[in-house]
Amino acid sequence: MEIDLNADLGEGCGSDEALLDLVSSANIACGWHAGGPNAMRECVRWAVEKGVSIGAHPSFNDPENFGRKEMDLPAGEIYAGVLYQLGALSAIAQAEGGRIAHVKPHGALYNQAARDPKIADAIVSAVHDFDPSVAVFALANSGLVTAARNAGLVAIEEVFADRGYRADGSLVPRKEPGAMLDDEDEVLARTLTMVREQRVQALSGEWVPLNAQTICLHGDGPHALAFARRIRNALEAAGIGVHAANAVRV
């Protein structure tokens, strides 16, 4: 049994290089919610050195809100914005001897794409026109998974061990109670359940089936790096290999 571990990098948390020793896929901010050319180049260089799969982490152009404010934009504008960010990271990756293997939208763009077909299709179209061999990381069971597969792209279904889930499989919004899980032992147990049993318990108590292909490790917070290391160690102790998503076999 295998799983991919991913983390969002280039966002100024300060632990990017160390996180790259723990994950198999890196989602690199493309400058619209955080990061910039220097951070992008640094993260790409480290990822290439450590053999970590490189992914783009595009967002709405909203640095003031860290890309977490929902926006109602025309599909063409979303398409162009995603394509623009992919182009920027791709140029840096090529110069450093790497390439973009996947795309994971950030923040509000990610959440809206999970439920809004217009936004999902705009993202998928941009990825397809950029390079149809690039995979899309999307919330498990979401509309973005469907849109990507309908367009002939590889969709990698993502789960979050430290986020609360609703009974419909969506994430509890960050501003609501139960959105974030703080008990490390609970999160570790939840991680193993997601991978082994392919399900997660919602806040309501119901069990939600999901296809866990990649797990997001959060790198922000004073104890995030140590906890990410605990998760990696727990998976390996349970006999679960950690490999980039394009090599995952569940």
UniProtKB/Swiss-Prot annotation:
Q: Which GO terms describe its biological process?
A: carbohydrate metabolic process
Q: Does the keyword Nucleotide-binding apply?
A: yes
In Gene Ontology terms, what is one molecular function of this protein? ATP binding
Q: Specify the enzyme's EC class, one word.
A: hydrolase
What's the catalysed reaction?
5-oxo-L-proline + ATP + 2 H2O = L-glutamate + ADP + phosphate + H(+)
Q: Which family does it belong to?
A: Belongs to the LamB/PxpA family.
- Give the protein's function: Catalyzes the cleavage of 5-oxoproline to form L-glutamate coupled to the hydrolysis of ATP to ADP and inorganic phosphate.
The name on file for this protein is 5-oxoprolinase subunit A
Gene source species? Paraburkholderia phymatum (strain DSM 17167 / CIP 108236 / LMG 21445 / STM815) (Burkholderia phymatum)
Q: Where is the organism placed in the taxonomic lineage, from the top? A: Bacteria, Pseudomonadati, Pseudomonadota, Betaproteobacteria, Burkholderiales
The gene for this chain is pxpA
